Amino acid sequence: MPKQKTHRASAKRFKRTGSGGLKRFRAFTSHRFHGKTKKQRRHLRKASMVHSGDFKRIKSMVSQMR
């Protein structure tokens, strides 16, 4: 049986934390900021953790990532 390979697009979008979680960056941050409030823009700058419902699926895609 062949080895499971890392999904390269996912590996570029997620980072593994020291405690084993997955960190992600938020969507809607590339353009059209004039329609967003300062508070929205400030919160979009922060990274967040992957939700538990998505964690198992994403973890299998980036299983070889350190």
From Swiss-Prot:
<dbReference type="InterPro" id="IPR001706">
    <property type="entry name" value="Ribosomal_bL35"/>
</dbReference>
<dbReference type="Pfam" id="PF01632">
    <property type="entry name" value="Ribosomal_L35p"/>
</dbReference>
<dbReference type="GO" id="GO:0003735">
    <property type="term" value="F:structural constituent of ribosome"/>
</dbReference>
<keyword id="KW-0687">Ribonucleoprotein</keyword>
<dbReference type="InterPro" id="IPR037229">
    <property type="entry name" value="Ribosomal_bL35_sf"/>
</dbReference>
<feature type="compositionally biased region" description="Basic residues">
    <location>
        <begin position="1"/>
        <end position="16"/>
    </location>
</feature>
<comment type="similarity">
    <text>Belongs to the bacterial ribosomal protein bL35 family.</text>
</comment>
<dbReference type="GO" id="GO:0006412">
    <property type="term" value="P:translation"/>
</dbReference>
<dbReference type="GO" id="GO:0022625">
    <property type="term" value="C:cytosolic large ribosomal subunit"/>
</dbReference>
<dbReference type="InterPro" id="IPR021137">
    <property type="entry name" value="Ribosomal_bL35-like"/>
</dbReference>
<dbReference type="InterPro" id="IPR018265">
    <property type="entry name" value="Ribosomal_bL35_CS"/>
</dbReference>
<feature type="region of interest" description="Disordered">
    <location>
        <begin position="1"/>
        <end position="20"/>
    </location>
</feature>
<keyword id="KW-0689">Ribosomal protein</keyword>
<protein>
    <recommendedName>
        <fullName>Large ribosomal subunit protein bL35</fullName>
    </recommendedName>
</protein>
